[in-house]
UniProtKB/Swiss-Prot annotation:
GO BP term (any one): DNA replication, removal of RNA primer
Cofactor: Mn(2+); Mg(2+)
UniProt cofactor note: Manganese or magnesium. Binds 1 divalent metal ion per monomer in the absence of substrate. May bind a second metal ion after substrate binding.
Reaction equations catalysed: Endonucleolytic cleavage to 5'-phosphomonoester
Family, per entry: Belongs to the RNase HII family.
Protein name: Ribonuclease HII
GO terms under cellular component: cytoplasm; ribonuclease H2 complex
Annotated EC: 3.1.26.4
Taxon lineage: Bacteria, Pseudomonadati, Pseudomonadota, Gammaproteobacteria, Pseudomonadales
Keyword annotations: Cytoplasm, Endonuclease, Hydrolase, Manganese, Metal-binding, Nuclease
Species per Swiss-Prot/TrEMBL record: Marinobacter nauticus (strain ATCC 700491 / DSM 11845 / VT8)
Gene Ontology MF annotations: manganese ion binding; RNA binding; RNA-DNA hybrid ribonuclease activity
Main subcellular localisation: cytoplasm
Domain RNase H type-2, first and last residues per copy: 16-205
SUPFAM superfamilies: Ribonuclease H-like (SSF53098)
Amino acid sequence: MAAKAFPPFECSYRGSLLAGVDEVGRGPLIGAVVTAAVILDPARPIPGLADSKKLTEKKRLRLYDDILENAAAWSLGRCEASEIDELNIYQATMLAMKRAVEGLSIAPEYVLVDGNRCPKWQWPSEPVIKGDSRVEAISAASILAKVTRDREMEALDVRFPGFGLAQHKGYPTPVHLEALNRLGVTPEHRRSFRPVKMALDAVGVYGGSSAPVQELNYPADLFENID
């Protein structure tokens, strides 16, 4: 069945200080969820922006450099595995998005977020279904977030050989699940995720040691307003 086609997005905000926000890494079993916020410069257009998942790696890397060079402002946000375990992945994603927008060197007047919900924050905003293919600023954010997280997975692959992280980027593929149940759970795995929790019970920790569990406390009003 063909994917549902969405019409071009029409935003009520017509100014130039529009930030697009997207995330990468909600589904993986390991590592941070990474977000990005981008304000594009109308005077320096970036041809070829599209959903990062639909681009070849070569084109994605070229656009990554173009965005860093030509965007009016950009910022990355993140929540680590320990924060994901404390908050849950959905709330952690909201917090990581908030961190990305807070990090922009130019304050946005309006924010568009990929998906169907926005975090609770001070900026006027709205969610955009399939925004990474309908809004250029969100497309740019998706590219920055994906390239950043992919590189982090390649670095973790060096730290923790045998899991195949450079290939599957931490997603629960058969290769990853087999390695998890053979090698054990690393300090970067998300212990609140069921396959990781099961491997921890069955096999234990990778290398026989684990990082200390950090106590984390967050006010509830950081997160999405669902009223």
